[in-house]
Amino acid sequence: MKNIKFLFIAILALVASACVESEPDYKNFPSKDVDFTFAVEGNEYSTDFYYVSTLQFTNTSSKQGTVHWDFGDGSSSSEANPTHKYDKSGSYNVTLTIDGVGSRTYPILIMDIVPMLSVAEQSAEIVTIKDVSIKLGIELPNPDNLTCRYVWNMPEGTTLADGTPIETFEGYSHDDGTIDNPGELKFNNIGSQKIEVQTYFDINGENRRLADSYINVQVGANIEAPTLYYACYGGNIKAYKMIDESQLPEGTKNLPFDMGVSSGVTPQNIIFATVDDQDFIYILDCGKNFCYQVDNDGVLGDGKITVMSADGKYANLVISNVGGHAFSDPFSGCVIGDKLYYNDRNTGFSTISLTDRGKKETRVNSNTESYFCSNQSLGYYNRGIAYGAVHTALAYDKDGVFWWPKCYNASGIFRFKTEDIGKTEASPTEVLLSGSTCKAFALDEKRNHFYCWLTSGAAGVGFAQFPKVAYESTLSVTEHTKYFKMSAAATAGTTSSYEALYVTQFAVDDATGNVYFGFIADDGETHPTGIYYYDYAAGEIKHFGNSSDKALGICINPRKTKLF
């Protein structure tokens, strides 16, 4: 019994001893009695914390004592109200400690210094090749008026005002605030002309390179022409002027414009429309989860429709399905009147006004009543269309007929009129290209053709032209009038050949009959990746210029302009 009591007492002693040894020092805990402020010395950059700026720290504590400052970068101070400079940009925690009172910590974000480029002057409202000059401006926050060296790198075809070619220009900043400038510049090539500037800061004798800057100068053509837009896979919306190169001055290149607006994740379609005499591009991005998903909770949707003005200066959200059902993402569509008609993955298509902005997707694939048209609402259902048939495109002709290609649980092109929706007792008419899979699709009613990108079927794989037959007639996939074998890449995102991307959209030039499309080459394909077109007059597939971008959605603005 005595042994047990002794053991119990020993344990209590050990516990008590442990408690005493681990007791924290409460005297310097965060305290409401400790506080401080900080600001940039001087007035010019008083609201911006740059890494070359001198910061004034002021102790505003209500209680006094010995102070210690920790600036979060390995340096400290015991001054009452110190100043400090940070050598690098980043986030720092600054702590003021007053012995016996407590401490206070505030985060501070120190910014990098980035030169800002702008077009300060231009000799005409629209910058065009050869004859319109610009002058660039540069602004650099420089609190200590340190000497800066600038290296300007010009795009190919840049000249001075007198026509002298210029590739690089090196200049310096000066004590009077001026910066050496290359002067007036002209451009020989159409497209986004990217001017890059490297900036070097002299800090304590160190030749430190700051973040590089660039500006895209949009340079138009010397003649008016339509504009071809396309969605780069993993990039921005880009554009080309649709100009016959024989009409360009000698040595001029027709290069793409970077519109500065994101294409999204998987932009299978982009659609041109004019609203109140303003031209817009609608971007249908079905997101990352565009193939079959197990989405029992209906939350994996990540697609959206955005709209961009033709010049890229305006962009806005039309409708979002982020957080909705994955199968309700927007895949493809067309404009009819003042509405955009757009497909989901495999239930049907809906409508939205071309002027709507900031909407949230409400359609549910389990509720067909939330669609303008669904698979189940047509007489084709169980007569060629099975449950969950996946859509690939949507078109509408001048006779009021919808053309609705399918690629899974249905094959071919299904045609119907608005009055056929809801009538399920019989098929509206015959199925076109039955047994085939048509991915990209377009109508050319002026020349009485339609076009398909075939991914399966008896005709083979590639680009095909067919005659536009009467509504009551049918057509087999082998009855094409033109066919070109081309192997497009399935592209990442799905293991199903039915839902692979291949070529997702065609754009028909009404003036020439040429059919444009983005092509991502499969392994072993002789045609390289880029923009292609079917030359209607020549009856040949041609590479558009020297394009090499991976493009999905594509459309044409027929309005003839020098720029946009």
PLM region descriptions:
Residues T526-F564:
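Blade-level signature of beta-propeller repeat domains, shared across WD40, Kelch, NHL, RCC1
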Residues G235-I243, N289-T306, T347-S353, N409-F416, ...:
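Structural motif
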Residues L255-T266, V318-A326, N367-Y387, E430-S436, ...:
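Surface loop/turn motifs at the tips and blade-to-blade linkers of beta-strand repeat domains
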Residues Y230, Y282-L284, Y342, W404-P405, ...:
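Residue position within the beta-strands of beta-propeller blades
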